[in-house]
Design a protein with these regions (language model features):
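Transmembrane signal-anchor helices characteristic of membrane glycosylation enzymes that use polyprenol
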Residues: 12-52, 234-244, 387-393
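Active-site-proximal, structured, solvent-exposed surfaces of multi-pass membrane proteins
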Residues: 9, 449-569
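Signature aromatic-anchored transmembrane alpha helix within multi-pass, membrane-resident enzymes
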Residues: 368-393
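Hydrophobic alpha-helical membrane-interfacial segments at the cytosolic entry of transmembrane helices
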Residues: 222-245, 317-323, 383-384
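Membrane-embedded helix bundles of polyisoprenyl
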Residues: 20-24, 79, 107-126, 130-176, ...
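Start-transfer (signal-anchor) and selected internal transmembrane alpha helices
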Residues: 1-31, 560-569
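Periplasmic/ER-lumenal interhelical loops and adjacent helix-loop junctions
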Residues: 228-229, 233-304, 421-427, 432-437
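Active-site lumenal/periplasmic loops and adjacent helix-entry segments of GT-C-fold
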Residues: 26-122, 126, 131-164
Length: 569
């Protein structure tokens, strides 16, 4: 009898996995069937990151530190400040299938499936119930905010963060309150989160600390918990030291242009707009469309109705959820926070990554209190159909977008939030279009106007000879570097080349095949003495021995966990 039940459970699991595969790719096919990508807030940034990695791999190099094939080809250290580990699958798919639109949607489909797998098995471990895990996975997969991130904003990094968050919160709960031996999963989850999205990592870390402090009196063995959390932190450091060392060393040694600081009181959501978008389940309209979806409102109403039946654990989730929602709105005193570290958020609604998970956990519990015939099946059907309908509405709403072509100023159009759609032919128009100054080195003594002026000179590939400007004759990208061909110079001159230098010891410069001494000017551009003739200059970023060692430590740590330790667990 046990064997029969075991076989039935295994068969049922296979059916569920097949269902997850179907919804993962069918939900994206609804959008992808026209052969277009639709413009999102972060599409330029992420397309450039993927294409940089593609070109790096195609040129037989494994790691991209600076952008030389994309992002204006001026050596911006995007991948030092914004980890790209999770983009390798997208890059490999892009290389294998050639069609960029198909490969990106295929990558997003795999991300969908990963979200299902992590959600299902972590919630199964948390609740001990297969059916609850299935319900939670459907709620989480079709959650409105996740789809806003995925297809409306094209924020791949935050979507990956959303995918791994159930693992983190489950491992945190187990480590602190139930099974202390699960600390290793906490370390792995936090490492995967850091490699996905630094801001999400900071938000999640902050909330874990808050939850830990709120529930300090519920720890049954404080010393053991502290020991296990310390072990998790140490393993986390081993897994991420390859990124953290280079990131911190570069960040602390120079001043960089941070992502734009915004007025939080202006980017916070108005309550009325949030409510309207919630009732509309809106993922497709321009403007203030950020919301948690109609299901979140239904779950909150049911939570209030069944409040007396809930344990203190779920009551706490209700209050945390309400706090997150209010935190994202103008009801929170954001004008008082403008001079604090909270400006790193840029948009208060980023906290919805927490609220989204909380409402799905709460919804799974609450829907279990509704005792109606076939309600379990009906609730799954409603969640699925509502999700698919909303995704289709996005497609219908954006199908009339203007086609991007070579004559379109892609960056300007996207900056003005114009609606565009991109096919395989026009995809290349996105690559040279990123004029974003984020992560470029800056001199705080220079005015904003002057810094912008110099940046525009640099991205147009002009050399600075005192007050004169000369266009580079030819530019060829190589992995983590470029080869420049200069025009003929009338006399021996000191020249600032259109290429950013972060830490001087990391760069090698060859002029006409010979190693050349160089300096760095006040704009952090490569400064060099050139003779009165044409020159071929190769500039390349070379990681230090310490950087290589830290990367190897992280690779070996992941390998040990993946091939030796985790199979035993």
């Amino acid at each position: 009898m046990y064997r029969a039940a075991h076989l039935n459970r295994r068969t049922f699991t296979k059916y569920i996995m097949f269902y997850y595969i179907v919804i993962s790719f069918f939900s994206l096919w609804i959008v992808a069937r026209s052969g277009y990508l639709y413009t999102g807030d972060d599409i330029l940034f992420n397309i450039n990151r993927i294409e940089e990695l593609v070109a790096t791999l195609e040129n037989k190099s494994l790691i991209s530190y600076i952008s030389t094939f994309t992002s204006n080809q001026v050596g911006i250290a995007t991948n030092i400040f914004y980890p790209n580990l999770w983009l390798y699958p997208f890059a490999l798919l892009r290389i294998f299938f050639k069609n960029p639109i198909f490969s990106i949607y295929l990558g997003l489909g795999l991300l969908n499936f990963l979200t299902c797998i992590i959600s299902h098995f972590t919630f199964k471990a948390f609740s001990g119930s297969f059916s609850k895990a299935f319900l939670f996975t459907n709620l989480y997969f079709f959650s409105t905010y996740r789809w806003i991130d995925l297809i409306r904003r094209f924020d791949i990094s935050e979507c990956i963060a959303i995918a791994v968050m159930p693992l983190i919160f489950w491992a945190f709960y187990e480590t602190c309150y139930r099974d202390h031996t699960k600390w290793l999963w906490l370390a792995i989850g936090m490492a995967l989160l850091l490699y996905a999205h630094i801001l999400s990592f900071l938000i999640v870390t902050f909330f874990l600390v808050i939850i830990f402090l709120i529930n300090l009196n519920k720890l049954t063995d404080f010393k053991t918990v502290i020991l296990e959390v310390t072990k998790a932190i140490l393993v986390f450091v081993l897994l991420t030291i390859g990124f953290l060392y280079t990131f911190l060393q570069t960040y602390l040694s120079i001043t960089i242009q941070p992502p734009r600081i915004r007025d939080l009181s202006m980017t916070a959501l108005k309550v009325g707009t949030l409510m309207q978008s919630t009732f509309e389940n809106n993922i497709y309209k321009n403007g203030a469309h950020f919301n948690l979806g109609l299901m979140s409102f239904i779950v909150l109403l049911l939570a209030i109705l069944f409040y007396s039946k809930l344990s203190s654990f779920y009551k706490q989730i209700i209050f945390l959820f309400i706090f997150c929602v209010l935190f994202a709105t103008t009801l929170f005193p954001w004008s008082l926070m403008q001079t604090t570290g909270l400006t790193i958020l840029q948009f208060p609604w980023r906290i919805f990554i927490i609220a989204n998970l909380l409402f799905c956990v709460l919804g799974t519990k609450i829907l279990g209190y509704v005792h109606l015939k076939h309600f379990d099946f009906a609730s799954i059907a409603v969640i699925t159909l509502l999700g698919l309908f909303t995704i289709n509405q996005f497609f219908v709403f954006n199908e009339e977008n203007t086609k991007l072509d070579a004559s379109t100023d892609a960056y300007g159009s996207l900056f003005r939030h114009e609606k565009l759609k991109i096919n395989q032919k026009s995809y290349r128009c996105l690559i040279p279009s990123n004029r974003n100054r984020d992560y470029t080195p800056i001199n705080k003594r220079e005015s904003e106007k002057r810094s912008t002026s110099v940046y525009n000179i640099v991205v147009s590939h002009q050399m600075l000879l005192g007050k004169r400007k000369l266009k580079v004759k030819k530019l060829q990208a190589i992995p983590n570097g470029v080869i420049l061909q200069t025009p003929k110079i009338s006399k021996r001159s000191s020249v600032s080349l259109p290429f950013y230098i972060y830490q001087k010891h990391n760069y090698k410069v060859l002029v006409n095949g010979k190693r050349k001494h160089f300096s760095v000017d006040r704009y952090r551009l490569l400064h060099i003495q050139l003779k009165d003739s044409k020159s071929t200059i190769m500039i390349q970023y070379i990681p230090s021995l310490t950087q290589v060692i830290t990367i190897m430590i992280s690779i070996l740590s992941f390998s040990f966990l993946l091939f030796i330790l985790l199979p035993k667990l």
